[in-house]
A protein has these predicted regions:
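N-terminal and secondary-structure boundary signal
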Residues: 66-341
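Arg/Lys-rich, positively charged N-terminal/basic patches that mediate binding to nucleic acids
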Residues: 56-58
Length: 341
């Protein structure tokens, strides 16, 4: 459904396993490491201004990830540079692209997340459609892990999921929320698995998100695959490939872990959803003997890259990976079925 009025839709302009792509817990609050905010002078700084304060040291202290160790600020990155790098990486003009981005990996982006969205749209062209995993900042089905006081307060006054208003999950960076609020954007009506899309195919990709099996065969993720879409990790880690949840959902394997949860939905009342478990994992990956602290989605993605499924390149300062959605899904389904079927 539309989430913003298309006043002038500028034609030029994930995460798997709920793993953050931000440098910290909140990419938009303090975690992206390349936020385009000035080093403001506080009272202490102002008082010491005439005392020879080392402003480079101040910058390092306040914004350590955006300041180079030897020369000061990270290199500036512009919209045109990003767009050209994206074209060189292999984005298909007029295509469907699902994006996972970590701003801090790119460098000091002039214009921040807004510039990134513009550059992605520049590379896709006016016929291209940009998609991002939005989910919801309220992780309702994880309530069993909350303190009893929080559960009671939530049950007393449960927030309603509203596709037009509810904030995208912060742990997946600033781009999904920036895209959600863009004029003409559409968001699917699922509190946990929702996606946001912008472009000519946005409504087609986000309509009728099923309440049961929200990552499955009739989900927006399946439609990205059917549309011959691509998936881009723009500096984001391999484990943030949300499309791999789609592979988990459609793999012919019995005994998948699932979760069922009820959410108040604006205008519709309480609704019950059943999905694969995207937090603990749909399968017992621990039984595979993977190295400790290794995310299985990273293992699958690296295996796909080694098999020639996907390409790796640089956009600005970031190492990036670009996958064909159908090829990645087919590889992941085969990988899962070989080990769990």
């Amino acid at each position: 459904m539309p989430v913003a009025a298309d006043a002038h839709d500028d034609a030029s302009g994930d995460g798997a396993r709920n793993v953050p792509v931000a440098a910290d817990a909140h990419d938009d609050a303090a975690g992206d490491g390349a936020r385009n905010v000035p080093v403001a002078a506080d009272a202490d700084d102002e008082a010491a201004a005439t005392g020879g304060r080392d402003w480079t040291a101040v910058a390092h202290r306040r914004h350590p990830t955006r300041v180079c160790e030897a020369v000061g600020w990270m290199a500036a990155v512009t919209r045109s540079q990003l767009a050209q790098d994206l074209r060189d990486l292999g984005l298909r003009p007029g295509g469907v692209l699902m994006i996972h981005a970590r701003m801090s990996a790119l460098g000091w982006v002039v214009g921040a997340a807004e510039t990134v969205v513009h550059a992605l749209r520049d590379a896709l062209g006016p016929e291209g459609t940009l998609v991002a995993y939005a989910s919801w900042e309220e992780h309702v089905y994880q309530a069993a892990e909350w303190p009893a006081e929080h559960v009671a307060a939530h049950q007393a006054e449960p927030p309603a999921f509203d596709p037009a208003l509810s904030e995208a999950v912060r742990d997946h960076g600033r781009v999904p929320e920036r895209l959600r609020t863009w004029p003409g954007a559409h968001r699917s009506a699922h509190p946990e698995a929702s996606v946001v899309a912008l472009g000519p195919r946005a409504h087609e990709l986000t309509r009728d998100h099923p309440e049961r099996d929200g990552y499955g065969r009739d989900s927006p993720f399946a439609r990205v695959v059917a549309a011959d879409g691509q998936v881009l990790l723009l500096g984001a880690p391999l484990e943030t490939l949300t499309l791999l949840h789609h592979a988990e959902a459609i793999a012919a394997v019995a005994g998948k872990r699932t979760v069922t949860f009820t959410v108040e939905v604006a205008g519709a009342g309480p609704r019950t959803y059943t999905d694969i478990d995207t937090t603990a994992g749909a399968y017992r990956y621990a039984d595979l003997g993977l190295p400790e602290d290794t995310d299985p989605f990273e293992v699958i993605a690296r295996a796909a890259l080694a098999a020639g499924v996907g390409t790796t390149g640089r956009v600005a300062a970031a190492e990036c990976h670009l996958f064909d959605a159908a090829a990645l899904t087919a590889f992941a389904v085969a990988w899962i079925e070989e080990r769990f079927a």
